[in-house]
């Protein structure tokens, strides 16, 4: 059981002070009964809560996918730059959202308020793969493919085995199961190459939807979320 104002505010559409105002105006009902106090408690999973004429669909956590564009940093706040949270629709802004991991380039990013889920998809022990399209400034080579497979030795230690599939003269697909700082750029740097373009296109078995435009955000379905952790 939780306080009714906390339940409603947790869903992001209304702040806690706004909820209290709505309650004072008799705009909130629980199981058909008008609520007169914000301290009333209810079970968010079973109670029928109606706010301003709209039934509340309770979600303990939200999971958002973002097709991250350039020019936004993977942080909750930044004094100098725009953050990925600036792209989140207003209806989610009251939730304690954060980006699940860093993405310094473009592509698929997960934004959530579920800390345990974020930890699980980022933990190297879980072996959840991340797939990237990459373009470099020189020709791809079989030496790179072999080096990625054997494990590139970086300044902070040897990388786990990674996959590099050559798709063009200077393009390829990289699959990692760990996420070090600027890892792909540093790995190609060991072969004298500079990464020109880098886009994350897949996490686990979930691919970036082709209809999700750059900068757009939408919620995961439960089935899509399962694909991430497979």
Which role does the model predict for each range below?
Residues 2-230:
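Basic, flexible Lys/Arg- and Gly-enriched helix-loop patches that mediate nucleic-acid binding at interfaces
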């Amino acid at each position: 059981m939780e306080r009714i104002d906390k339940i409603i505010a947790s869903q992001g559409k209304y702040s806690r002070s706004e909820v209290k105002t709505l309650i004072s105006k008799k705009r909130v009902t629980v199981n058909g009964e008008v609520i007169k106090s914000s301290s009333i408690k209810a079970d968010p999973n079973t109670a029928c809560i109606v706010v301003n004429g709209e039934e509340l669909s309770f979600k303990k956590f939200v999971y958002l996918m973002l097709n991250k564009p350039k020019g936004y940093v993977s942080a909750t706040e930044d004094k100098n730059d725009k953050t990925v949270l600036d792209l989140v629709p207003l209806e989610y802004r009251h939730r304690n959202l954060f980006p699940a991991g860093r993405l310094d380039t473009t592509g698929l990013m997960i934004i959530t308020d579920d800390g345990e889920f974020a930890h699980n998809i980022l933990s190297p022990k879980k072996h959840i793969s991340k797939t990237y399209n990459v373009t470099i400034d020189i020709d791809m080579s079989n030496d790179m493919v072999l080096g990625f497979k054997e494990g590139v030795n970086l300044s902070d230690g040897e990388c786990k085995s990674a996959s590099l599939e050559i798709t063009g003269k200077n393009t390829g697909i990289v699959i990692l199961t760990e996420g070090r700082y600027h890892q792909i750029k540093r790995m190609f740097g060991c072969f004298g190459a500079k990464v020109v373009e880098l886009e994350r296109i897949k996490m686990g078995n979930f691919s970036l939807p082709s209809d999700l435009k750059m900068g757009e955000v939408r919620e995961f379905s439960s089935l899509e979320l399962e694909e991430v952790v497979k």
